């Protein structure tokens, strides 16, 4: 690689002979190397240097070569602390020099120098330069990839589900993940790499990644296809910071998994899509051997007649059994719900949502609400065209909206609503609800009514961590699938002075001092922000165990999550909520509760990249008969 200055780039992503003026172009390039020439074109180099020199005025460390880019990065601190001042200075210089360097370009260079320890970390500057904060404000970076189109992407024919032969079942070209998949020939390595590098360039840490695998029904793909696909995801994660000039060969899936435990870019969770009736002992064992931690499954509806109408071929009994088996064996559960299906009405769907909210057998961790859309390549489009199916979202839109508002107000605090409305472009929707930003519309209407929703997503701390010091552990118990779920979370309330918590502290101190009894706080009712949470399951005695017998009498920690600005695992004292002991305290509390419920230990469905975290607290990896790691276990 030719060098034009003393700055040597470690990460290689575009052709060294090509000048790229827009970093988005880098991602679609099929070449591998990047040089300073490709990041900053020759004809703009002097302009950019003059731009940066004038914007900054700072004496650098004399041991570091004076560099106009570094001068720009460490300019006046007042500029960094004020978004308005930063933008004003930026715009003035853009006008003067008739050029506009992207923030992502500047931030990319900043991170290069930071990784080489040439410059100190500047958190305020990062806040000004990072784009799309929302991508990592939930504590992890989510990368969605899609399986290749295949004759067996789904062997079922649900009448609402599009079957475009060019793509995996239920997906269309216009969806963002599908577009990225097609650009990368549905290759797992390329999809992961291009998405991760895009995030990295835009300023997000990429050392904690959660993978969502989309595309039909995962269980319908042949094991060889699915295993190789996941192997390539781990390979991409393990080698993302390697020199592409000397790339190593792919190893087996299980070798790549072991490498990922100690990689810079760790996969901390994998989500797959399947059907409730596909949840079996064999399938759950296979999922764990792949590193899968979360299962998305389509419930769609609770009325068997409606499910039969749309040829779902899956009954309520099968749905409940699948949910129970997965939860009893430690998995996180996301469910998909479809109001406005053929033969449904607002009254029927209201009853459906009531059932899913209140019935212990339907309790899930996350929801995706997908109002039925009439699309090409579906059977229901024929019914729609002939007039035998008329979605009530068209005939009674206000009732449709009011139903969803009621749902959002009624969601229990242990559930997260991930999405409302599929990501279909508006021009693909031929009938039913055509509002593509439906969640935003609902959020606005709820805000107008001054209502605070209690679901997890509505209460996430995001980047506003100013009340983190007020967070306390709140416990919620609820029945679920013939077992008990304990939802522990760090929350803060909007009370001026929380009398309930004050009284709890006094009672807790006295009971512990005189009787050795632990008292738990169940909330004051005014909690408005969540910082972290943990899901602990205590299964019934005779539940169906899919794994080793040592797994049976354990409290299952199905999820541990800390929200807020995502900090790198290499930051020992990052800003925001992460790395401040929230996870440790929840883990300790869960172990105490499991002990009180006569468990002989706890086990965690730990993502591959989180195993070392749990080892710090006495957890050890449990191996199956094929010597594949499954759960992290701690015996009391």
List PLM regions with ranges.
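Short, electropositive alpha-helical surface patch
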Residues: 224-232, 345-364, 424-443, 614-625
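Conserved active-site alpha-helix within GNAT-family acetyltransferase domains
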Residues: 606-634
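Conserved acetyl-CoA-binding loop-helix of GNAT-fold acetyltransferases
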Residues: 573-593
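Flexible, acidic/Gly-rich N-terminal and inter-domain linker regions that tether
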Residues: 2-178, 182-191, 195-245, 413
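Conserved non-cysteine loop/helix-boundary elements of the Radical SAM core domain that shape
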Residues: 173-191, 211-235, 240-402, 577-580
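Conserved GNAT acetyl-CoA-binding A-motif
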Residues: 593-606
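Radical SAM enzyme [4Fe-4S]-AdoMet core and its adjacent flexible, acidic
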Residues: 371-416, 422-467, 569, 573-577
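A conserved beta-strand-loop-helix scaffold within acyl/acetyltransferase catalytic domains
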Residues: 479-494, 516, 525-565
């Amino acid at each position: 690689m030719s060098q034009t200055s003393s700055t040597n780039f470690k990460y290689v992503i575009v052709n060294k002979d090509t000048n790229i003026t827009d970093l988005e172009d880098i991602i679609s390039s099929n070449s591998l190397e990047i040089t300073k020439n490709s990041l900053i074109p020759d004809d703009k180099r002097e302009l950019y240097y003059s731009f940066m020199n004038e914007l900054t005025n700072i004496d650098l460390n004399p041991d570091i070569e004076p560099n106009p880019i570094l001068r720009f990065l460490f300019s006046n601190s007042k500029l960094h602390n004020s978004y308005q001042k930063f933008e004003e200075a930026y715009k003035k210089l853009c006008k003067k020099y008739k050029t506009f360097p992207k923030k992502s370009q500047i931030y990319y260079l900043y991170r290069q120098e930071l990784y080489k320890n040439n410059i100190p970390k500047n958190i305020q500057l990062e806040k000004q330069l990072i784009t799309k904060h929302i991508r990592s404000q939930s504590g992890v970076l989510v990368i969605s990839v899609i399986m290749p189109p295949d004759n067996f992407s789904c062997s079922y024919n649900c009448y609402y589900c599009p079957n475009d032969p060019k793509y995996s079942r239920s997906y269309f070209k216009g969806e963002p993940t599908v577009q990225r998949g097609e650009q990368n020939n549905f290759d797992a390595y390329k999809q992961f790499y291009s998405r991760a590098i895009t995030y990295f360039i835009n300023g997000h840490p990429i050392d904690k990644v959660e993978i969502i695998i989309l595309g039909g029904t995962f269980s319908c793909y042949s094991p060889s296809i699915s295993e190789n696909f996941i192997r390539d995801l781990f390979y991409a994660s393990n080698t993302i910071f390697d020199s592409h000039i000397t790339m190593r060969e792919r190893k087996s899936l299980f070798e790549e998994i072991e490498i990922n435990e100690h990689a810079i870019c760790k996969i901390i969770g994998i989500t797959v899509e399947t059907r409730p009736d596909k949840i079996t002992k064999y399938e759950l064992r296979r999922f764990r051997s792949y590193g899968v931690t979360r299962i998305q499954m389509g419930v769609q509806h609770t009325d068997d007649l409606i499910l039969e109408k749309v040829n779902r071929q899956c009954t309520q009994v099968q749905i409940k059994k699948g949910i129970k088996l997965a939860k009893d064996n430690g998995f996180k559960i996301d469910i998909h719900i479809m109001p406005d299906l053929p033969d449904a009405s607002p009254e029927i769907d209201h009853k459906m949502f009531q059932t899913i909210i209140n019935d212990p057998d339907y309790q899930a961790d996350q929801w995706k609400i997908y109002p039925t859309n009439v699309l090409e390549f579906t059977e229901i489009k024929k019914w729609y065209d002939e007039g035998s199916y008329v979605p009530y979202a068209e005939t009674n839109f206000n009732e449709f909206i009011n139903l969803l508002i009621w749902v959002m107000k009624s969601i229990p605090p242990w559930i997260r609503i991930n999405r409302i409305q599929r990501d279909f472009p508006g021009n693909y929707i031929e009938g039913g609800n055509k509002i593509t930003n439906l969640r935003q519309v609902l959020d606005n209407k709820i805000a107008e009514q001054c209502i605070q929703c209690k679901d997890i997503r509505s209460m996430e701390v995001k980047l506003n961590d100013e009340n983190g010091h007020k967070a306390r552990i709140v416990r919620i118990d609820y029945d679920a699938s013939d077992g008990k779920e304990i939802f522990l979370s760090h929350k803060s309330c909007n009370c001026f002075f929380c009398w309930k918590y004050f009284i709890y502290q006094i009672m807790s101190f006295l009971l512990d001092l005189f009787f050795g009894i632990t008292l738990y706080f169940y909330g004051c009712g005014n909690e408005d922000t969540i910082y972290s949470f943990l899901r602990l399951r205590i299964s019934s005695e005779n539940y169906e165990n899919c794994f080793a017998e040592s797994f049976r009498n354990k409290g299952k920690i199905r999820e541990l999550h800390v929200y807020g600005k995502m900090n790198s695992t290499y930051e020992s004292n990052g800003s925001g909520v992460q790395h401040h002991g929230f996870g440790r305290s929840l883990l300790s509390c869960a172990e105490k509760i499991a002990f009180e419920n006569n468990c002989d230990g706890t086990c965690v469905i730990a993502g591959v990249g989180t195993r070392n975290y749990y080892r710090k607290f006495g957890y050890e990896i449990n191996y199956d008969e094929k010597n594949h790691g499954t759960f992290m276990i701690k015996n009391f």
